């Protein structure tokens, strides 16, 4: 894991590549592109309303906590975004 990241969110042309690398095609339509924070792409799940934050290369995952992005495992990130009961 790396140190927490603080960066402003910018919105521009959607970058779907990181999401396409980590999710099966049948799940992609459940996400909205929300923007970018530094090198982290931000996607929001339409049903759970939770964010899936993925590095631009699709290799690292982050949770937003106390004003910073903290690296988590892929399993933790996917479980968080898919589970409304947490």
Predicted regions and their residues:
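Acidic, low-complexity, intrinsically disordered interaction modules
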Residues: 22-74
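Compositionally biased, low-complexity segments enriched in small residues
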Residues: 1-2, 44
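Mixed-charge, Lys/Arg-enriched low-complexity segments
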Residues: 2-24, 64-86
């Amino acid at each position: 894991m790396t140190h927490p990241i603080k960066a402003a969110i910018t919105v521009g042309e959607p970058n779907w590549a990181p999401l396409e690398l980590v999710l099966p095609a049948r799940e992609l339509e459940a996400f909205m592109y929300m923007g970018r924070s530094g090198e982290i792409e931000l996607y929001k799940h339409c049903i759970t309303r939770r964010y899936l934050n993925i590095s631009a290369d699709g290799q690292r995952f982050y949770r937003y906590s106390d004003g910073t992005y903290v690296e988590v495992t892929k399993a933790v990130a996917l479980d968080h975004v898919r589970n409304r009961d947490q």
